[in-house]
Design a protein with these regions (language model features):
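N-terminal auxiliary segments of SAM/dcSAM-dependent transferases
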Residues: 13-48
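Conserved alpha-helix/loop element of class I SAM-dependent methyltransferases that forms part
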Residues: 63-86, 101
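Class I SAM-dependent methyltransferase SAM/SAH-binding core
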Residues: 87-147
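A short acidic, Gly/Pro-enriched loop at the edge of an enzyme's catalytic core
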Residues: 146-157
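A short SAM/SAH-binding and catalytic strip from SAM-dependent methyltransferases
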Residues: 156-170
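A short glycine-rich, Lys/Arg-flanked "PGG" loop and its adjoining helix->strand segment in the class I
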Residues: 171-183
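Conserved class I S-adenosyl-L-methionine
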Residues: 186-215
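Core SAM-dependent methyltransferase catalytic element
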Residues: 250-272
Length: 272
């Protein structure tokens, strides 16, 4: 599969199309500080964290979400329209769970690209893709969510799951996703959000900032602080209404969202 610029998308490849960006703060690299950074500094710090946990990422997701992440992803994929010979992109695909769920919705001649900036995470995703015999249907590709490098109007659908809060420039990422969608194409975004009940917010904060770092570190034996960064990044991410407005500002229309698990996560659906 190639694009008009001549890039070939087969197997796990490296896509380099990242212009210079600026460090958002001069703070020392601590997990809580990184969650407020922007640009290249944030990107590099986040990549180090995810590289350290790539091999246990799926296990940790299951343990830390009590298995709910599977349900959340299945519901997210259900918002992707069924298309004959469709083309879909999963941004920040990580270990490719969402890409695998989207693939059947693209039809027998459809293709899905699972993109992520982190090589180690994509290696884990590629194992799943090839293990299911889908190497010709799903391509794993290293790409920056802010500068995806595809021509305008390439995809019928773009999905993302738990990626957007990790990008250095969220507005830029949303605009680039809008650019590469075909007119009428759909963007489906699954991300952690703000619980809608006060008691749930209190419980969720205790779990996120107290229990999650302890459990994550014990399971992953991680020393990078990623399990402190993750809840901090969730707290600093736009809530349901703010993200909806950002999608509208990026040029999307008919933007709606659905809360799952009391607003712990939300699915935003936007049409170009």
């Amino acid at each position: 599969m190639t694009n008009p610029e001549g890039r070939c998308y087969h197997g796990l490849m490296v896509h380099v199309d990242t212009p210079p960006v600026h460090k958002g703060t001069d703070s020392p690299e601590t997990p809580l500080a990184v969650s407020t950074w922007s640009g290249q500094a944030r990107e590099q710090a986040v990549q180090r964290m995810f590289t350290s946990i790539a091999g246990v990422y799926d296990l940790n997701n299951t343990l830390l979400s009590f298995g709910l992440h599977y349900r959340w992803k299945k519901i997210t994929a259900s918002y992707v329209p069924v298309i004959t010979a469709g083309r879909a992109l999963d941004v920040g695909s990580g270990t490719a769970d969402l890409a695998l769920l989207v693939e059947p919705r693209m039809g027998i001649n459809g293709r899905v690209i699972a993109s992520d900036l982190n090589h180690a995470m994509l290696v884990e995703g590629l194992k799943k893709v090839t293990g299911r015999g889908l190497g010709k249907k799903i391509t794993c590709l290293e790409a920056n969510a802010e500068h995806l490098g595809f021509p305008d109007g390439t995809f019928n659908a773009v999905t993302t799951g738990f990626c957007m809060r990790n990008v250095g420039n969220l507005r830029q990422a949303l605009m680039d996703i809008h650019r590469i969608l075909q007119p009428g194409g759909r963007f489906v975004c699954l991300e952690f959000s703000r619980p809608i009940f006060g008691w749930l917010r209190t419980l969720y904060d205790w779990y996120s900032f107290r229990l999650l770092p302890w459990v994550g570190t014990k399971v992953a034996h991680d020393t990078t602080g990623v399990y402190e960064y993750l809840p901090a990044s969730i707290r600093n991410f736009p809530d349901q209404e703010r993200l909806k407005q950002m999608l509208l500002d990026a040029g999307f229309r008919q933007v709606t969202y659905r809360n799952l698990s009391g607003g712990i996560v939300a699915i935003h659906v936007a049409t170009k």
